[in-house]
């Protein structure tokens, strides 16, 4: 496993931060199908989604509904850059006139996303998660941690933490 720490200025567009952009360039290939459930202005993934209809994305769904669109083991890679805090989740929903409920502001909101990502990724598929912690998808869902990138932004700004994980290949057939 690789652990790296590279300082960079913060940006509301996570994928434009240089060390993060460099990491993405190492993992994402044009021949693969990548999805992004929280694309905002990003065009890196093959199939994009953002709850906010003001962004030019392929879909404007709640992220959970977006992930549920895909068949089991059908996606090569997932970019998972959700709102980092429950307050940010609430702001995103309110910003597009959606009701903020107990369901959208509990930690189970993220767990449901992670369950769907685990289901749709192909064996050996990659999930790149962004946030303020390094939980990622996790070993308990059959993922292997390949890389952690810490991007400190200085002062009182929270670091951006990036985890890169691979869905373990399992062959359950005996013959």
Residue locations for each model-derived region?
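Conserved acidic E/D residue at the C-terminus of a beta-strand in Rossmann-like folds
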Residues: 47-53, 62
